[in-house]
Amino acid sequence: MNRLLASALLVGSAVVAPVSAACIKNATVTEVDVAIIGGGASGVYAAARLIDNNKTVVVLERNADRIGGQTETYYDPTTGTPVNVGVKVFSNTTVTTDFLKRFDFPMGTLNVGQTLATGTQYVDFATGKLIPNFTAVVPAVQAAAMQRYAAELAKYPQIKFGYNLGPQVPEDLVLPFGKFMEKHNLTGMAQTMFEFNSGYTPLLEIPALYILKYLDTYELQSLQSGSFIVAANGDSATLYRNAAKFLGERVVYGVSGMHIQRSSAAGGRVTISVGNSTTGTHMIRAKKLIVAAPPTLDNLRSTGLDLDTTEAGLFGKLSAGVFYSLVVKDTGVAKANLRNRHPANPYGFPDQPFIYSVIPLPKTSGLAQVLLGSASPLTASQVEARVAADIGRLPASLRGNATSVPKVVTMAAHTWNVMAPVADIKAGFYDKLEGLQGLKDTWYIGAAWATQSSTTIWEGLEQEFLPKLLAAL
């Protein structure tokens, strides 16, 4: 992409005013094969593979200085140690390792099961009391439960990369996951499911469909083998820094306003106008549009997408929880990983919103990572208050006699688990949603269509989505 386009589209944090027809008519125009909204795992992978197939692309990214979506890293200003506050692990598949190698990602391995079992103490954060003799996992029982889970998962190949549920949605898929576990004797893996499915809250009430999609074949195999890929240098964002160098000026950063017009006519074009009072307006005309952003109605409207009533009606059914990954100072927690349980509840799962865990971070200036889940968005002040209160009531023995108030130094809020109501799922919601693919030259990809797993997103793009898109170009 030429420097003129890059400079014309660098809008920083300015708010873009509505674009008039006259502005669009007089704007500079750049033609591309595909415009991509969102530079996360799906958008970046799609862009790279389209370039491999000799297609021209532009990636429109809201962040002012990075791509990578939910892959975020905090760097301790005192020690420089990286702390991943987003994506930490990848499943080991050929598509995954090829993509990581392509961008010189330093690969290491992590045994998640071993990590959960090592140096952990269980605490009721609602009371601050230790829970003695809490047994999270019985290895043989869990292994047998995982085998039964794998057998259930194998019944639904139609949800591997999408939601091809058909007219008769299997009843098991809309069962609350707690009932699904009981029905299929999976309770022996409940504790690991709770930790591994962080962000899916309340876990026992979420339709089994979404849990089966998240803990899919790739993730389950990695969990069973104990082998996930991690960044050997501790910094998952390495992948996207290197990918950004490859994409170069094909990425437009800091996009805070757009106006998108699509045509229903065959062979039409998608017109995207971007600009502000400083740079003026620039227009991109694309053969196809990829939306690689969470498809909640508010989020799509914020992109300037010209949704019709059918599209708005469908996307308006979707809602999402939020998973907060925090770096906190002055916790005093230094010797053990603290995991939250409430003994009075089924399986000890705490009431949401709640802290999942407090993990001390080695090689930092006394920092800890705190994970918090909520079925609905919280304000920053609500998150900070929850962290201060819950950690503040821990006994002195766990806080090293610290008396200072814990303070959040960075907060990554991730849109998590975009879901539809059960009644709509039963009524064929996902068949209708899948029917939007390709209409008005618009295609949708990302976690809401695959799952919150980079590996599954990339596998789905490679095996199913990209062949269809390339055939349509």
Swiss-Prot record:
EC number in record: 1.1.1.-
BP terms from Gene Ontology: terpenoid biosynthetic process
Glycosylated residues (UniProt): 26, 54, 92, 133, 185, 276, 401
Pathway the protein acts in: Secondary metabolite biosynthesis; terpenoid biosynthesis
Domain of life: Eukaryota
Pfam families per the UniProt record, alphabetical: NAD_binding_8
Keyword terms, alphabetized: FAD, Flavoprotein, Glycoprotein, Oxidoreductase, Signal
Biotechnology: Diterpenoid pyrones display various biological activities and subglutinol A shows insecticidal and anti-HIV activities.
Leader sequence residues: 1-21
Segments passing through the bilayer: none
The keyword Flavoprotein is annotated on this UniProt entry: yes
GO molecular function: oxidoreductase activity
Record has Cell inner membrane as a keyword: no
Cofactor requirements of the protein: FAD
InterPro entries reported for this sequence: FAD/NAD-bd_sf
Enzyme kind, highest EC tier: oxidoreductase
Family under the similarity heading: Belongs to the beta-cyclopiazonate dehydrogenase family.
Protein purpose: FAD-dependent oxidoreductase; part of the gene cluster that mediates the biosynthesis of the diterpenoid pyrones subglutinols A and B. The first step of the pathway is the synthesis of the alpha-pyrone moiety by the polyketide synthase dpasA via condensation of one acetyl-CoA starter unit with 3 malonyl-CoA units and 2 methylations. The alpha-pyrone is then combined with geranylgeranyl pyrophosphate (GGPP) formed by the GGPP synthase dpasD through the action of the prenyltransferase dpasC to yield a linear alpha-pyrone diterpenoid.
Protein name: FAD-dependent oxidoreductase dpasF
UniProt gene name: dpasF
